[in-house]
Amino acid sequence: MLARPGLLLACAAAIVAAAVRPAAQAEALFEFHSNPWLNLHHILWARGERSAPPADMTNADRSAWNEGIAFYAPYAKRDLLFDEELVKIKVALRTVETNTSLDGVVIDAGVKATLERLMPIYRKHWWPAHDRTNREWIAAARTLVDQYGAALNAAIARAYGVTPENPVWVDVAVYAHPVGAYTTTSPTHVLISSTDPGYSGYAALEMLFHERSHAWGRMLFDGVTAAATAQGIKTPPPLPHAILFFIAGDLTARELKQHGIAYKHYAEGGLYDRLCGTGCGVKLAAHWGPYLDGKRTRAEVFTALVASFK
């Protein structure tokens, strides 16, 4: 749901995803992973969330586990998305999914030692169930992407005027972020929850494309900023994120509607109002809906949407 701004990709021709045969859509668009190191790291950051010590845990293991959570306590006060060290840890752990140690991984020595000390305990008591949960979520998401992914990917690309760099790396974890998911860029790396009920069913499809769209979030920030400056209007700071929600949500709803499926945007449950004020969802539909229909330009829509906050 959240992301660090990335550089805007250059405008290019229509993407080739629509030509991918259906059975390969998920693999072509998203590369899914269930990484024990990233799962453990995020559980410790969340002070043991999703990992209540089992009754048969030895005193030694329980003590070591509690010490690890205590070590991570200062990190738990820092933002997973905007704290540079936490981002570096996430990036470093991304590629060691199958490693039995963190040899050669360049992260804080204390973090490395804590993760290596606790990994055998985590594997013994929690990882088999967590990995199974992650892979069940991945299987369900793959099915949806296989059915609807190519068309939705093409629509997202048209909306942003880009050629997406696919596949996007997606790590699935039992605990991902307080809001369920977050994305870092350069390269685009999504981390998404397998246990958050808000990311299940068709919402998983929307939120995968929402998260990957953060690669172009800077475009929305710059567009809102330029229009607001030109008109001397102050807009809600989360407005660019609300636009990103609307684009992914509306395009997902449009694609599913073509298959006879009624779908409500993730943010239509009150999130639009929380992001940018009462009635914001109506404003987004009034201005960005015509843009997605191909009837207005982005510049026109930014100007009109910002004006609605006067």
Feature-to-residue mapping (PLM):
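Mature extracellular/secreted ectodomains of secretory-pathway proteins
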Residues: 57-136
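Post-HExxH zinc-binding segment in Zn-dependent metallohydrolases
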Residues: 25-79, 90, 94, 220, ...
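Auxiliary, metal-adjacent structural segments of Zn-dependent hydrolase domains
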Residues: 128-185, 240
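Pan-zinc metallopeptidase signature
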Residues: 263-310
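Bacterial Sec-dependent signal peptides at the C-terminal "C-region" and cleavage site
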Residues: 15-25
